[in-house]
């Protein structure tokens, strides 16, 4: 089955391609995959990866390698809202495991799972989200939430619809 990228996704990819030399379209593959994943409810299918490869003139294997290497890409259906808890050393020393435990209890799921209603996906361990000064922290739909407490976590999660 052949999938076509919607016009607005192709336009977004074109904006990224324009940032690189003409012979370096490959440099825009991460941004292209982000655009395709966002369009498809937060995950990539093989058909979507093939469409990105075709649009960029790349071998499909190159796109698959990128999509399966980086933790920011999902290759199976997941919840609408993506929650990532940083577990690197700075966050760990400031209570990230307690944050993970609290989120798992509150949502009734483990890392790598989505809530039964498909509302929230708790990503597997994130090695570093580059916000060490605000540890412990988590990212929800690409927005950083720092200096977390059980109360602030509950408020953040309760506001997700």
Each language-model region and where it sits:
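Signature of N-terminal electron-transfer/Fe-S-associated modules in redox systems
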Residues: 1-161
């Amino acid at each position: 089955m052949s999938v076509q990228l919607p016009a607005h996704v192709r336009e977004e990819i074109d904006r990224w391609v324009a940032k690189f030399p003409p012979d370096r379209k490959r440099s825009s593959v991460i941004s292209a995959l982000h655009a395709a994943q966002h369009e498809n409810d937060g995950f990539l299918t093989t058909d979507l990866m093939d469409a990105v490869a075709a649009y960029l003139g790349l071998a499909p294997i190159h796109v698959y390698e990128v999509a399966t290497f980086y933790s920011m890409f999902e290759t199976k259906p997941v919840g609408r809202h993506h929650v990532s808890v940083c577990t690197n050393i700075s966050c760990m020393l400031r209570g990230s495991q307690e944050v993970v435990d609290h989120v798992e209890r509150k949502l009734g799921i483990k890392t790598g799972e989505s809530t039964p209603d498909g509302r929230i996906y708790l990503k597997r361990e994130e090695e570093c989200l580059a916000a060490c000064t605000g540890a412990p922290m988590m990212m929800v739909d690409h927005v950083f939430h720092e200096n977390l407490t059980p109360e602030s976590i509950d408020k953040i999660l309760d506001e997700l619809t």
